[in-house]
Amino acid sequence: MISNEFNRNVTKDPPYPGLHWGGHGHDPQQVKKAGAAFLRGGAFKPRTSPYDFQGLGEEGIRLLLEAKKATGLPIVTELMDIRNLPLFEQVDVIQVGARNTQNFDMLKELGKTDKPILLKRGLAGTIKELLMSAEYIMASGNEKVILCERGIRTYESTYTRNTLDLSVVPVLKGLTHLPVVVDPSHATGHAHLVEPMAMAAAAAGADGIMIELHNDPPHALCDGAQSLTPEQFAHTAGKIFRIREAMEG
């Protein structure tokens, strides 16, 4: 399913080429106009503190479905508890967050579904651990896996939220046939760092880029510090597309 090194070898083309991702807390029509191919929003939010905003739950999924209907864009949201899987029937892509990357029982159950799975790298996960988590899903029957680099925990925490490991993009693309997405928002934790790292991810060959958005970042209930405005996103997306055009030309 992934490579000879990991006991599988599937040489199919990536099933989701050319992805570009929008975040949440924004006008979805603006994001679509800027070039986003998917909308992602957190209905269930994994937070370090139990006192922080935990998401809207089932109501959040309903709002995502409204955005899907309005724009025609497929939606992505995170599953935190396998017992909530029935609520995700109309969700197009299920995200497995960094905290659940090695929740093997969940991965096995997701392997029994037919939905694409966006699998984030663990907080301090190695490349091999990420690939083994992908194998859990694929060995259970679901080969629609998308790998996501979202930054790993290192000794640096003063100036960045995590450390974005861009080398993982060519490494994973060399080892696997699976699409590789980069999340510079969670990796850096700061809006002013998102654009340069998104551009670097595009240059490294990422198949998709996930960017957090909000109409009013200072007043966002979560992740405001790393969120771009829709206008900033449109500017950044334009640069990303030009990089990809230059690489393809």
Predicted regions and their residues:
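Conserved, mostly hydrophobic/aromatic
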Residues: 31, 39, 88, 119, ...
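Alpha-helix-loop-beta-strand connector modules within alpha/beta enzyme cores
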Residues: 53-77, 109-116, 166-181, 226-249
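Active-site mouth loops of central-metabolism enzymes
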Residues: 12-26, 50-54, 74-78, 97-99, ...
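Hydrophobic faces of well-ordered beta-strands that scaffold small-molecule active sites
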Residues: 12-20, 37-41, 75-77, 94-96, ...
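Glycine-rich, proline-tolerant flexible connector loops at the mouths of alpha/beta enzymes
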Residues: 40-59, 214-227
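Glycine-enriched alpha-helix->loop->beta-strand junction motifs that scaffold or abut catalytic
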Residues: 35, 87-95, 111-117, 138-144, ...
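Conserved anion-binding
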Residues: 43, 47, 100-167
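N-terminal amphipathic alpha-helix/helix-capping segment at the start of soluble metabolic enzymes
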Residues: 1-26, 238, 245-249
